[in-house]
Amino acid sequence: MDIDLPEVVAEVKAAFDRYEKALTSNDLGVLNTIFRNDPRTIRYGIGENLYGYDEIKAFRGARSPVGLMRTTARTVITTYGRDFATASTLFSRATMPGKLGRQMQTWVRFPDGWHVVAAHVSLIDEPKAA
């Protein structure tokens, strides 16, 4: 199996960047196309467990568009073959002082492009500087 083929990493990076832009601008149209429209798609959030595309879409539609801007760090995209990838990133928001967010996504290439099939978002206390 080929791991981290440069052209596949670039494709997933572009999809991840598209997600980030849509997330921080609350572009529901784009967000709704990124997650796989399937009842098996799962998103575990900071305060919610969403099972299936319909629950994810409803959550996004009901969420406040205020305070979504964030800064990402240590983003790692790893691809396995040409059709499977993970994207992991840390994030911080001005609205969450002292907290560090962590996000992991599982991406799969389908005939219509790359989609998230599973995601997990969590918060921890920001580590103290040594």
Language-model segments: residues:
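A short local loop/turn or secondary-structure capping micro-motif enriched for an aromatic residue
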Residues: Y51, A94-P97, I124-P127
